[in-house]
């Protein structure tokens, strides 16, 4: 009886590993289903797959464990993340139900299916437990290789054909033929003139020499800031910095000091008038 | 611990994946749930391989992985081309087969 039990159970270490990592795997799977954003789902699924790789290693499937990490978490999940980035990370699933009560029915179906599967396993007579030790005696990779290239050689060849077909299929599906001719630079310029858009290059940002940062609007001759000088992206993000009066006053103080040191008396009239007018405008 | 527990875990993961396919409407997440189901099957295969003491289960799991890789490549290409034509990855919007 005890011998049978010993053959039937695994070591305590593996049991602890199973219960700890199994919980993580189930939580990861649940998060995959219930996270609203696709990126979070993908990351949770990657975690579950790594846990499964550890289980493969614990079950003596060393080759599959490594392949799981390299192919699944390394290649497939990264491909998923690439597509999520293409489609848009911020696009969260809408929570509006299109079919009434579909979510609860789906949960009910899932529950029923799970109960069916688990009671099925519980009733099956799984008396046989041989352990993988003997099969792995000559090495796991060698054992798999000798089986693949003898008994499963046709399946292996067909898998190769499948992979080639999939690669060609993906290229055909994502390749897009250009239907119209790309417009030349001359045509684009003529169109711009016809539409009456702003033709010359846009004015540079920055206020005098102290603020040539791109997020500060340049001043027009009358001292008012011009929105046109700041890049469109910054304008749409609302990241334009104000030309504060304090900075202007600083600048004026600096110039006055410079003038005193240089012992200049007359101030250039254009500068002076620009300051005064900007002050008036701000008031 | 009885190694049959691995089968229970596989059944649980498969069920979660199947429920996800029914609940979610984002095509990418549905696809991820399918991957989860495939992985659960692989775990069951590996556990069976250990129970029976031969490597056939592991080889089937290996073939499953190759087929899953091919499936992901084609499936994601379909999702990308759907997104290009409809600007949405929701399975509700793709009610017609034509693009």
Curated annotation (Swiss-Prot), chain B:
Q: Where in the sequence is the signal peptide annotated?
A: none
Regarding the membrane, this protein is recorded as:
Multi-pass membrane protein
> What residue intervals traverse the membrane?
3-23, 28-48, 59-79
Q: Where in the cell is it found?
A: Cell membrane
Q: Name one GO biological process term.
A: ATP synthesis coupled electron transport
Keyword Transmembrane listed? The answer is yes
Family from the record: Belongs to the complex I subunit 4L family.
Q: What is this protein called?
A: NADH-quinone oxidoreductase subunit K 2
What is the originating organism of this protein? Answer: Streptomyces coelicolor (strain ATCC BAA-471 / A3(2) / M145)
